[in-house]
Structures are given as structure tokens and as C-alpha cells.
Amino acid sequence: MADVLPRSDGALLRVCRGEPAPVTPVWFMRQAGRALPEYRAARGETPMLQACLDRDLIVELTLQPVRRYRVDAAILFSDITVPLALSGVSLRIEPGVGPVFDQPVRRAADVARIRPLDRGSMTPIVEAVRLLVGELAGIPLIGFAGAPFTLASYLVEGGPSRDHAVTKALMYSDPATWHALLDRLADISREFLLAQIDAGVSVVQVFDSWAGALHPDDYRRYVAPHSGKLLAGLPVPRIHFGVGTGELLPQFRAVGADVVGVDWRVPLDVAARRIGADAVVQGNLDPAVVFAPWPVLEAAVRDVLIRGRAARGHIFNLGHGVLPSTDPGVLAAIVDFVHAWSADRSARGVPTAVDRFGSEHPAAEAAG
């Protein structure tokens, strides 16, 4: 199978390190998912958690979007709740709802029931990573895990929440239990990442999907130490992404991220200015723009690319996951456009943010 996959020119890893690359690398969050007919055929009715522990299915579902889209990276097919299930937490993933927990965690005794993650329970995942590294033949494999706050929110609320009110109530009213919970979750997610790294992933991404619900001061006090513990000293490039986290971008970098993922709400030139010197960013096309006519979509993709040049490095991605009704052909066209546009600019020597916007535009200011 490896002979039908594109060879990596190292663009993604170079950008993660803040080095120049011949093209802007591109991959998509949730690129392995229901937008692909081959995904639907391969997974069938297999429950999500079961699929995430089936070695051969993990391999197949991870490779499908690389074959289809010719992206610059694969991301391991999994779910952020998998290490919780492996740590003895009773949960199920309900279609259209998300993870649902039978026993919410709201007291110190509840935290004590969450076991440390045993690597022995990860055998199918570790074996899948090793097989994938061979199949991908040089294309980077991204591993991932959930950030402590987002996992805690699911556990405390018992499932997805709009306002995270129960989570915040615990955070404010019982900080000892709160910090004990996040400390345990940081250990679990870190072990999950280290097992993937030891098996061969080249990059990791930490998803803090719900951190945007927090005031920056609360993030700094109640969350940042635990995200920092999770990310500290990992021996591969680290991407940190959250939704609605425009006010947290500098802190996402400060807790240990090499690359900061940006959702579609914040222009990348603005994000680069907020993060500061040597910012490397990932994102951030609105996932819904893929349904627009091609001239509109092309203009939006080009705008993301140009704004991304205000940062030291840019990985093109969506600002959140691929929507299930997305046309795979459109994503393939985006990949081709990103590669062609950025290769041409690299060969000719950039049109900079100043060239595109003028010296008074924020993108030009961020570009310095």
C-alpha cells in the first residue's frame, strides 16, 4: 500500500519547527470520518469505542484520507475519550450526541475511582501506530489526546454541555477536587501520548475543545498548570487546539505548544500578533465554507493562506473538524490549491501580507 501514497517532503515537520518549507502543508481535523464513503463502508455499524480499539480498522480508517486527499499528514483514528475508557471509566459514545458517562465525577471519591492508564490496555493502538508508520512511508502520523479541561468537562457534566455550569461550579467551589481531577487526567492523556510517540507518531495534537468557555484568568489559574504538565517535554512537535479560544491563544503557546491551532473566528494574522514572536499557527478555514461555490471557496482559502504568512509558519487546516456532509472532492481540490499556490509563492518569493493588504492592514503589522 505504501507505494500508492505520496512521499513526504518534510513540509509539516519543518513548519512545526518554525523552518521554511517548499509548500504550505495541509491536513484536516476529522479527515477520517463520515464525509468519506469508504469510511462509512469500512466502519459500518461498529460502535465508535470498539472501532478505536480494533487494530486493523484503526489502520484502514487512518489511511483512507491520505489516499483520497493527498494530505501532508495522517492523524490517528481514535477519540479523546478512549484513554478514559481504558482507565475504567464507564462511558458510551452516542451518535449525534457524543460521549455520555454513566457516573459523573463530582467528588474526591469519584476522582479516586479513575485508574491510571495501563499501557497494556493500549496494545491495539500501539500496534496500529507501528503498522501505520510503515504504511505511510515517510508521511507524518499525528497522534492526539484530549486536554484535561475538556475531558473534565465531559466527566463532570456527564456528557456534552452548552454552558459547562456544573464543571465551573466544581472548579470554583471545590478547587482541591478540581485540581486532583485535572492532575489525574493530565497523567492519563500524557501516558496516552507517550505510548503513541514511542510507537512512532511524529507530531501530537492536544484538543481542548471546550476551553473557550473559560475566562483567561480562570484558564490561567485552574487549567494552564495541568495542560502544561501534559505537554511538558514531549519529544515531538506539539500542536494545541481549542474552539472559541481567541483570548487564550497566548496561553496555549505558553503551556508548551510549538504550534497553536486557531478556529475560524480569529483571522490568522490577528492570531499571530496575539501569540507573539515566532508564532507557528494552524488553521483556519471555516468548515462551512466548503459548501460555497468554488470561486467563493477559493477566495476564502487564499485569504487564509495569505494571512497565515504573517506567522513564522503555517499549517493549513480547517478551523474545526470536517463536517459529515462535506464533499470529499472539494477537500481534495483544496489540498491541490494550497500546494500549488504556496509552491508558486515559494518559488517566486512570497507575496507578503503587505503585498496583498497594504501596509496599514493588521496582517502587514503582524508580519512586521
UniProtKB/Swiss-Prot annotation:
SUPFAM superfamilies on file: UROD/MetE-like
Catalytic reaction list: uroporphyrinogen III + 4 H(+) = coproporphyrinogen III + 4 CO2
Protein origin, superkingdom: Bacteria
Record's keyword annotation contains Lyase: yes
Main location: cytoplasm
Pathway: Porphyrin-containing compound metabolism; protoporphyrin-IX biosynthesis; coproporphyrinogen-III from 5-aminolevulinate: step 4/4
InterPro entries cross-referenced by the UniProt entry: UROD/MetE-like_sf, Uroporphyrinogen_deCO2ase_HemE, Uroporphyrinogen_deCOase
Enzyme Commission designation: 4.1.1.37
Cellular localisation: Cytoplasm
Site residues, Transition state stabilizer: D79
Keyword Cytoplasm: yes
Its biological purpose: Catalyzes the decarboxylation of four acetate groups of uroporphyrinogen-III to yield coproporphyrinogen-III.
Family membership: Belongs to the uroporphyrinogen decarboxylase family.
Name of this chain's protein: Uroporphyrinogen decarboxylase
GN (gene name): hemE
